[in-house]
């Protein structure tokens, strides 16, 4: 029996639903997987499960002011589906785009919302996964089986954002909140706001709140590189004025953004001092003449060792220039009744404190995995090309790029998984298992010399690992994987079929 075949099963008095492919997650990766399954395998059964009440994943959960993309949408959009909006888009615009994909690919009936995957167990005898699911809407436990499991749930612990232990936090009399759990009724009009953090979320929240707040202070322990980018690309305007197919416009813009991005990442790796100077020079015209750019926007790490925060039309810089927002680089001594006292002795008054201090990573949604009764410890497993796990049969996962747009890798992975499923059918194989030899050395999923933001470094001990050689490595670079993944040899001995 190949992974495309089904057979009825029962448990107790009820039937257990079986699908050929079970996709976990109805965000960008999961909906993209659904498109590829629908397009490449019209006769194959599949379902998409998601914990939340609606589609979108991160874009559904992020409700904080100004929530938007931190990548351009011409590369964040799917390869098959032209993006027709601005280069940088709001969460609402992205959700509308996903709705179009769901409708065009007839995915609505395949998505099961409020289905939280709790555990999954593989049986080699049956060549299938048994998946335990908790219905969030009814609190009942249900079971499904599948021939192939495709984990597209992302890597954020949405219900457990990262917030450090701040001394004296209980003393502050106003609200303290994390962007991940933003209250819908919060009113910051005319209020003094302190946003703790310096990453993409802080760079989004600060200008959005500054529109109506009395003043917003971004308090950071260390700086982040930031860059202003046009919300609407001039080339997009020019191309859309021409009488050419939208698909051409999309592909031209997509390639343009990819090559521009590749050039900056190349410069950052090969000539980091030149890349640093370029970024600082790009920021200066947007900021007040007396602004201390070296102190506030010149981090110690080299460019792209952590993500560069993208500012649509330089919105946060504009808030600073207009006096609506400011940046303070210091460490917190303690919260007080009326704000925050810093190590320098300065006190920041606040009515509201926002802790934009990052996220915790989740390894496969913290789902319990077993293979033939043995628990899987992912922290002791290497990945096959950053897509499958050593010793875990018939399971693929999507982990996008740290620097490039997430969806670029999601599309490449969908291509490879589709090719693998077809290859299994051609071989008459029921299962495929990545199998690394005992001499493959375990290395961190992300090399700190390459990419080392706090949310990644905090999670290295519980994340899956890279090996010391191909195909047990993860390149993290689209410029390389756009060639290596389509050319991956599925019969090089690293995958065992049965």
Protein language model features and the residues they cover:
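Rossmann-like dinucleotide-binding core of oxidoreductases
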Residues: 13-18, 22-23, 28, 32-33, ...
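Beta1-alpha1 glycine-rich phosphate/pyrophosphate-binding loop at the start
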Residues: 16-23, 28-111, 220-221, 286-291
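Short hydrophobic core segments
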Residues: 24, 117, 143-156, 193-196, ...
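Short FAD-binding loop at a beta-strand-to-alpha-helix junction that anchors the flavin cofactor
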Residues: 77, 175-176, 386-403
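Short beta-strand to alpha-helix junction loop
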Residues: 82-100, 112, 196, 267-275, ...
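Feature captures the FAD/FMN-dependent oxidoreductase FAD-binding
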Residues: 85-157, 334
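Alpha/beta-hydrolase fold catalytic core
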Residues: 277, 286-349
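C-terminal active-site-capping segments
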Residues: 411, 415-498
């Amino acid at each position: 029996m190949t992974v495309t075949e089904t057979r009825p099963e029962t448990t107790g008095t009820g039937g257990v639903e079986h699908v050929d492919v079970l996709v976990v997650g109805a965000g960008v990766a999961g909906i993209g997987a659904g498109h590829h399954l629908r397009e490449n395998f019209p006769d194959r059964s599949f379902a998409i499960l998601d914990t939340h009440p609606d589609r979108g994943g991160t874009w559904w959960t992020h409700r904080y002011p100004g929530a938007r993309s931190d990548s351009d949408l011409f590369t964040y959009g799917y390869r098959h589906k032209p993006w027709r909006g601005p280069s940088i888009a709001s969460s609402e615009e992205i959700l509308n785009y996903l709705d179009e994909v769901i409708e065009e690919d007839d995915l609505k009936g395949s998505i099961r919302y409020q289905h939280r995957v709790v555990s999954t167990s593989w049986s080699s005898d049956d060549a299938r996964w048994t998946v335990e699911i908790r219905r969030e809407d009814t609190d009942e436990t249900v079971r499904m089986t599948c021939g192939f499991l495709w984990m597209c749930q992302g890597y954020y612990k949405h219900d457990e954002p990262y917030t450090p232990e701040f001394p004296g936090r209980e003393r502050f009399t106003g609200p303290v909140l994390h962007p991940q759990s933003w209250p819908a009724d919060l009113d910051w009009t005319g209020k003094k706001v302190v946003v703790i953090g310096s990453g993409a979320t802080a760079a989004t929240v600060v200008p959005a709140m500054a529109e109506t707040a009395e003043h917003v202070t971004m308090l950071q322990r260390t700086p982040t590189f930031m860059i202003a980018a046009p919300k609407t690309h001039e080339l997009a305007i020019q191309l859309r004025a021409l009488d050419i197919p939208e698909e051409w416009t999309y592909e031209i813009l997509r390639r343009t953004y990819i090559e521009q991005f590749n050039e900056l990442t190349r410069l950052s790796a090969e000539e980091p001092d030149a890349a640093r100077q370029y970024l600082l020079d790009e920021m200066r015209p947007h900021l007040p003449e007396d602004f201390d750019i070296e102190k506030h926007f010149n981090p110690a790490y080299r460019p792209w060792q952590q993500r560069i925060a993208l500012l649509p039309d330089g919105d946060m810089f504009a808030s600073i220039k207009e006096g609506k927002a400011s940046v303070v680089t210091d460490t917190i001594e303690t919260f007080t009744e009326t704000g925050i006292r810093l190590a320098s002795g300065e006190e920041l008054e606040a009515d509201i404190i926002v802790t934009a201090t990052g996220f915790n990573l989740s390894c496969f949604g913290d789902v319990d995995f077993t293979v033939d009764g043995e628990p899987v410890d992912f922290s002791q497993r290497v990945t096959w090309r950053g897509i499958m796990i050593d010793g875990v049969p018939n399971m693929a996962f999507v982990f996008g790029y740290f620097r490039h747009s997430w969806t670029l890798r999601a599309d490449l992975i969908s291509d490879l998984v589709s090719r693998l499923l077809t290859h299994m059918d051609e071989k008459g194989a029921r299962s495929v298992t990545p199998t690394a030899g005992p001499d493959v050395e375990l290395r961190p999923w992300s090399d700190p010399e390459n990419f080392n933001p706090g949310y990644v470094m905090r999670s290295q001990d519980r994340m899956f690992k890279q090996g010391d050689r191909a195909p047990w490595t993860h390149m993290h670079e689209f410029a390389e994987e756009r060639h290596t993944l389509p050319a991956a040899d599925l019969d090089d001995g690293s995958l065992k079929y049965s």
